[in-house]
């Protein structure tokens, strides 16, 4: 019998009897992976190799394992939610800038065709410190909620924390906000969180992060039907990002009525009907528009 798909779970427990080393060793992992790869190429069988991860979230064992295979996928997500993200770290035959969103249901994993709607579920009404971002995950625009909490510090050095957003980038953006938007954050702790387990790694998420911080700092609410898109520079300018028309179409499709974007957008914009677009030049102007 020739199967269409072969799943090896896990590569660290497989062993070759001709190899005297213990299962999980470097030589065993290499030998077993090579055997599976030869079987896949010669018989035309799709092989999935499941591997353990270490405490840092990387694949455990020798790096040669990642070099031997055609595609490396990470299955990740918040253990407190039922949603899981499938990310590609390596793809020999396509782009790695794509994600798959799934939900763990009673019948197993099911696809989430509209991840933006999922990530915006349960948004608080009338709460300061929250702003909606629109980022590109590969070729797909995704909307996500960014939350911030700014509170008076009790420490000599104010605390900074970020979940779902690069920590160093968050610290940089708060420094820009303090310098260019007159926000005295040096006596406040600041915490940033991206809802739904999504990680925002692209420049278009800069502006919504700063607006969420400003909203919590001023204790003023950002309109629930507003989305912010833009990169923040060190001088406080709001810079353009790519795929603006796709982002605006997704914003409109999900029922949002307002969108703050950079004034100097390089694309010829096609603004959807019913969507009000506010073009801003710098951070101070963006904060005043949003609040």
Where do the PLM segments sit?
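Peripheral, non-AAA+ core regions of ATP-driven protein-machinery
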Residues: 1-5, 11-63, 67-291
């Amino acid at each position: 019998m020739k199967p269409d798909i072969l799943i090896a779970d896990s590569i660290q427990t497989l062993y070759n009897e001709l190899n005297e080393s213990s299962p999980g060793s470097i030589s065993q992992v290499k030998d077993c992976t090579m055997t599976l790869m030869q079987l896949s190429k010669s018989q035309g069988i799709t092989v999935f190799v499941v591997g353990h991860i270490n405490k840092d979230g990387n694949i455990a064992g020798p790096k040669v394992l990642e070099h031997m295979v055609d595609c490396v996928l990470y299955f990740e997500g918040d253990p407190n939610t039922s949603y899981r993200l499938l990310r590609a770290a390596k793809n020999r035959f396509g782009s790695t800038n794509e994600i798959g969103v799934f939900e763990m249901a009673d019948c197993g994993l099911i696809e989430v065709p509209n991840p933006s709607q999922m990530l915006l579920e349960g948004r608080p009404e009338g709460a300061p410190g929250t702003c909606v971002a629109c980022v590109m995950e590969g070729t797909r625009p995704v909307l996500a909620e960014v939350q911030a909490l700014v509170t008076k510090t009790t420490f000599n050095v104010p605390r900074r924390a970020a979940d779902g957003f690069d920590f160093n980038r968050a610290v940089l953006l708060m420094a820009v906000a303090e310098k260019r938007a007159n926000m005295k954050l040096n006596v406040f702790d600041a915490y940033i969180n991206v809802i739904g387990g999504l990680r925002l790694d692209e420049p278009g998420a800069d502006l919504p992060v700063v607006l969420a911080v400003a909203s919590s700092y001023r204790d003023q609410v950002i309109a629930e039907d507003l989305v912010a898109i833009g990169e923040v520079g060190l001088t406080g300018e709001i810079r353009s990002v790519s795929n603006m028309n796709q982002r605006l179409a997704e914003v409109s499709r999900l029922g949002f009525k307002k969108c703050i974007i950079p004034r100097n957008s390089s694309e010829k914009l096609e603004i959807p009907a019913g969507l009000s677009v506010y073009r801003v030049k710098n951070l101070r102007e963006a904060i005043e528009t949003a609040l």
